[in-house]
Amino acid sequence: MALPWELEEDILSRLPPISLVRFRTVSKHWNSLFNDKTFINNHLSRSRPEFIILTNSKIYSVDIIDHNNIDPTIRLHEIPTYDIHSRGTDLNRTIINTCDEFLFYNYRYWDNMTALWNPWLRQVRWIEYANQEFCVFGLGYDNSRPEKVYKILGHLFCHGKVLRDQKVVIYECASDSLRFIDRPEDDDWPITETAKRSNVSLNGNLYWFGCSNYENDEYYIRIFDFSTEDFKPFCLLPCQMSHSTDELVLAVYKGDRFSLLKQCSVTREIGVWVTKERISNDNGNGGEGVEWLKLMTLSKPNLPKLFGTVSYFIYGKTLYMCNGDDETALACIYIVREDVCKKFQIGSGNINCRHCVYTPNLLSLPLFIG
């Protein structure tokens, strides 16, 4: 007896993409779901964040098993590399983060290697720009338009000029063209290497930490608005650094808000704040236009000392982090809540890696048609 089609769809929408892709050939009906926007959105709403980890030779996804269980664990999947690794394996030059539901891969400016990537659909779209002196910062789009026309923010590297004097550039993906825009008038230029690795994309805009006073470590959130193509302060942080070696990490929370993680470098205590309202172009005015709520404080004695690039997400009342081990520098997944602090090492030996948080989905890559 065949199940009703609506029930089949509901069951399939709860499966991870790695399983769904295998079922495409079962029937024409099932295969058609990959082009059904309602099904794709239902599936995305039920997907949970994972970690994507790039090493010099392999790419992994790390899924959390039994989120709400008393003893959560992880599941490691090796992802086919396609031609990602064939173009470059020096991870010191590699940046990976997300723009909406896509992975954004960049292998620095001198190698002309930038791509959007959906590993579950086995899709990679390389963005080719003729000028190899283009140093990429991040990807976004004008959110005032009904369709998403993607753009890349960066600067042209001009030999013989100091970084402060580099020209700010927008690369138009649809027309394959570069054009200059005005440089920020304040001192927050050039964008630091740390900001390039840790910027956050939300609603088509890029966000990162700016500093109004480096002597006193006074940080705030800056935005590059792709609709107006300008740099500006977005909002103040709910906390400041107590020590110059404290860690501050910005992330997307529940798809439309921000979370902020702070770790004290002395006590290793971790605090997490989240924004009360969803983030939009209008609720940040450079000051106190965004309201933050303290979500959790974690002060276990075996908390790791976070350093370098930190990826994290919050699910329920649990904090999930990817970072190097503070003794061996090996990539590790940490699961932390009031009653749990677990560490899982990824691989063995001296593994250099890049990582980010990513929600698996069935969204096809854009064609970059304006």
UniProtKB/Swiss-Prot annotation:
Q: Where is the F-box domain?
A: 1-43
InterPro entries in the record, alphabetically?
F-box-assoc_dom_typ1 (IPR006527), F-box-assoc_interact_dom (IPR017451), F-box-like_dom_sf (IPR036047), F-box_dom (IPR001810), Gal_Oxase/kelch_b-propeller (IPR011043), SCF_F-box_component (IPR050796)
* GO cellular-component term (any): SCF ubiquitin ligase complex
Which is an annotated Pfam family here?
FBA_1
The tissues where this chain's protein is expressed are given as: Ubiquitous, at low levels.
- GO term, biological process aspect, one: protein ubiquitination
Q: Which domain of life is it from?
A: Eukaryota
Query: Would I find Transmembrane helix among this entry's keywords?
Result: no
Keywords attached to this Swiss-Prot or TrEMBL record, sorted alphabetically, are:
Plant defense
What role does it play? Negatively regulates a plant defense signaling pathway which is independent of salicylic acid (SA) and systemic acquired resistance (SAR). Confers sensitivity to P.syringae and P.parasitica.
Record's protein name: Protein SUPPRESSOR OF NIM1 1
Q: Which organism is it from?
A: Arabidopsis thaliana (Mouse-ear cress)
